[in-house]
Amino acid sequence: MRVFDVSRLRNPKAVSTEQKSQPVLKIFLKIAVTVITVFYGLVPAIADLNETHLFNPLWSEHARFHGAWFLAFAAGIALIALFLIWVRDDVFLPIAFGLIFLAGFWVAMVFGPTYGGALVDENGYAQTVLGLDSNMFLFSLVGVFLLILLALARRISRTGK
């Protein structure tokens, strides 16, 4: 958004400090949303393309199918989000994609006991950060960061600042 600056009437080449800082904030926002998008599009594949997940011989073929489907879906959504961020200049939908991705994790975790799901497989290994399951810790942190970025995006959109 452009903010009209009266000083430009006297000096057309003059640019206010607010106008200079806006592109910096917008670029920061786009880079931050990009980092999170790459996180949810790439990190699950790195974490799950091994013998504890997708190549786990104890998983049924159908479970492995769903695992591969999830990884392809996450990567595809991330590619669309990157297109929206850098070509369409839109961060709102990519932020929504990230929040939906995280919501899927939390729904699966909360309802896990009803369908026999668990955060860690018996033949897997549990990683913790500060005493919390590493996924819970990381997804909580990313969720808070996404909400902060959403607030920043709304501020820039409404005020141009």
Sequence positions of predicted segments:
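Core segments of alpha-helical transmembrane spans in multipass integral membrane proteins
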Residues: 42-44, 62-82, 103
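Juxtamembrane helix-break-helix junctions at the cytosolic face
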Residues: 79-94
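Membrane-interface capping segments at transmembrane-helix boundaries
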Residues: 152-161
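Individual transmembrane alpha-helices with interfacial aromatic-anchor signatures
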Residues: 126-143
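Cytosolic juxtamembrane helix and N-cap/initiation of the first transmembrane helix
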Residues: 6-38
